[in-house]
């Protein structure tokens, strides 16, 4: 919005929400809405790209909302990688800080997500290699910035017709207990240590999710479709076996330790039997991802070098991110201060250069 002064805005009501956007963005069509905002597809007349415009819902309603708005903008501005959604534009119709109440974010419009792909077709092993390689390539970048996704699942992975993939909605997920309750996909892909508050978690929570997604791509079935937290844990332990004493000692929650010790002993299943007919290298990688002990779980960078990705792995083309300053996370500010920081981020935004091979869906 650094060039906000050159924007001419127009107004349109969509689904009882007033949208006020620059006239370069035409044909606004609602495509979805959630707790944090609503999204329209649109045509960018300057770049001839189909884009997504997200209007944040009540961005400065409370301190929590205001900090989340600032966090989302900071994260999106930082991400500059082929396999991660990035920011094409950010704007507000406000002409001054005093008028500043609405924030609109512009990203690529992604056609389908991995959920659609899995439902529609049986994937070949080559497809699985390429898709999982791209997820890990994006994760290596995100993790190198010190960011954890926390909510990787098929619906957060956008894919176009050429099988090119981008990771969406990262780093924002701080789900409430309510959202994690019952038969919900939000939890099926969650690492046990984060789902059950076992201990301080690290970036490999995302690797557990990739393992769950990869298993689903190979078999066409959800790996751990638990009906609740306890059922989910039982499904996990049935596959990977009862935790070793060494791991139990690392679980800081005494209640969790006692509960696990009360369960009957379960041996680890043979992954080759579970994933019968799958590429042996795929099975080997799954065994390294679906490890209960986070200290022993493979990292994104290590996984990229696994033999399963031999035809795609290129150490010179798996970039890492610039350092990302997250010191704001520990700051205690009021709404006006978060709003001021957000306003500064909006006004100093510089659009990315247009890539000749822009990813369209």
From Swiss-Prot:
Residue positions, PTM Phosphothreonine: 181
Residues at the catalytic site: 151
Enzyme's top EC category: transferase
Regulation: Activated by tyrosine and threonine phosphorylation.
GO terms assigned for molecular function: ATP binding; MAP kinase activity; protein serine kinase activity; protein serine/threonine kinase activity
Origin: domain of life: Eukaryota
Keywords: ATP-binding, Kinase, Nucleotide-binding, Phosphoprotein, Serine/threonine-protein kinase, Stress response, Transcription, Transcription regulation, Transferase
Catalysed transformations (reactions): L-seryl-[protein] + ATP = O-phospho-L-seryl-[protein] + ADP + H(+); L-threonyl-[protein] + ATP = O-phospho-L-threonyl-[protein] + ADP + H(+)
UniProt key word Transcription: yes
Positions of short motif TXY: 181-183
GO biological process, one term: positive regulation of myotube differentiation
Post-translational modification: Dually phosphorylated on Thr-181 and Tyr-183, which activates the enzyme.
Cofactor(s) annotated in UniProt: Mg(2+)
Family: Belongs to the protein kinase superfamily. CMGC Ser/Thr protein kinase family. MAP kinase subfamily.
Function: Serine/threonine kinase which acts as an essential component of the MAP kinase signal transduction pathway. mapk14a is one of the four p38 MAPKs which play an important role in the cascades of cellular responses evoked by extracellular stimuli such as pro-inflammatory cytokines or physical stress leading to direct activation of transcription factors. Accordingly, p38 MAPKs phosphorylate a broad range of proteins and it has been estimated that they may have approximately 200 to 300 substrates each.
Protein name as annotated: Mitogen-activated protein kinase 14
Organism: Xenopus laevis
Gene of this entry: mapk14
């Amino acid at each position: 919005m650094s060039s906000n002064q050159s924007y001419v805005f127009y107004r349109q009501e969509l689904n009882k929400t007033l949208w006020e956007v620059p006239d370069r963005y035409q044909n606004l069509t609602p495509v979805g809405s959630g707790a944090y905002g609503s999204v329209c597809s649109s045509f960018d007349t300057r770049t001839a790209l189909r884009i997504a415009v997200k209007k944040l819902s009540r961005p400065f309603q409370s301190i929590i909302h205001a900090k989340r708005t600032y966090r989302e903008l900071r994260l999106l501005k930082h991400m500059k990688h082929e396999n991660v959604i990035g920011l094409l534009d950010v704007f507000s119709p406000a002409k001054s800080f005093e008028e500043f109440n609405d924030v609109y974010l512009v990203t690529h419009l992604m056609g389908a997500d991995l959920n659609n792909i899995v439902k529609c077709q049986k994937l070949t092993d080559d497809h699985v290699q390429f898709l999982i390689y791209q997820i890990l390539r994006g994760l290596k970048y995100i993790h190198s910035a010190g960011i954890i996704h926390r909510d990787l699942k098929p619906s957060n992975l956008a894919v176009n017709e050429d099988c090119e993939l981008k990771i969406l909605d990262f780093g924002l997920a701080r789900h409430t207990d309510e959202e994690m309750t019952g038969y919900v996909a939000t939890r099926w892909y969650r690492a046990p240590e984060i789902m059950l508050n076992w201990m301080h978690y690290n970036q490999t929570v995302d690797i557990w999710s990739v393992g769950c997604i990869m298993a689903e791509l190979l078999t066409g079935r959800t790996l751990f479709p638990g009906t609740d937290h306890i059922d989910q844990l039982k499904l996990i332990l049935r596959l990977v076996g009862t935790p070793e004493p060494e791991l139990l000692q690392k679980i800081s929650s005494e209640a969790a330790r006692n509960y696990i010790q009360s369960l009957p002993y379960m041996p680890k299943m043979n992954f080759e039997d579970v994933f019968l007919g799958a590429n042996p290298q795929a099975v080997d990688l799954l065994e390294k991802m679906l490890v209960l002990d986070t200290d022993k779980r493979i990292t994104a960078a290590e996984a990229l070098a696994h033999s399963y990705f031999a035809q795609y792995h290129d150490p010179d083309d798996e970039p890492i991110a610039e350092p990302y300053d997250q010191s704001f996370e520990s700051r205690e500010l009021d709404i006006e201060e978060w709003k001021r920081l957000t306003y500064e981020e909006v006004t100093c935004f510089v659009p990315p250069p247009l890539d000749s091979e822009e990813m369209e869906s």
